[in-house]
């Protein structure tokens, strides 16, 4: 979350000033990359909030898996080629690179959780439990 705050402070402050002096192609790349940066960070934050909800017992892992499909991670790292990317302000490049690394880590963790969730045994209803319930129902007042 600190990276989200750092990116917001940069984009609303010094980044805005730096973008005004960029050549046209780099200014367009700046706009694209800043949107990708914020989207990437919001997706990571959403994923982290889901995991926190599971850890705090607010959601089951199955419920989180169902919600997880709303979090869309893009495999595209940057919104422009490396030549234009190098023309962007150093701070934007740094924030973008850090956000991509975090997204890659989250995607790896997410994949690990998906694999672990798919290996969880499905609790089958036993015949004995079913018969006990029928007996209780038959003899209850």
PLM feature spans:
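Surface-exposed peri-terminal alpha-helical interaction modules
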Residues: 1-141
């Amino acid at each position: 979350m600190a990276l989200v705050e750092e990116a917001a402070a940069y984009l609303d402050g010094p980044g805005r000033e730096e973008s005004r002096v960029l050549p046209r192609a780099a200014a367009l790349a700046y706009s694209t990359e800043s949107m990708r940066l914020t989207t990437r960070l919001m997706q990571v934050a959403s994923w982290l909030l889901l995991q926190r909800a599971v850890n705090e017992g607010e959601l089951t892992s199955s419920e989180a898996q169902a919600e997880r499909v709303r979090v869309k991670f893009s495999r595209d790292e940057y919104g422009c080629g490396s030549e234009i990317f190098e023309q962007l302000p150093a701070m934007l490049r740094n924030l973008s690179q850090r956000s991509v690394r975090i997204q890659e880590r989250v995607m790896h963790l997410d994949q690990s959780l998906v694999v672990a969730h798919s290996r969880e045994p499905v609790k089958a209803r036993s015949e004995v439990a079913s018969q006990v319930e029928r007996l209780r129902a038959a003899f209850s007042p």
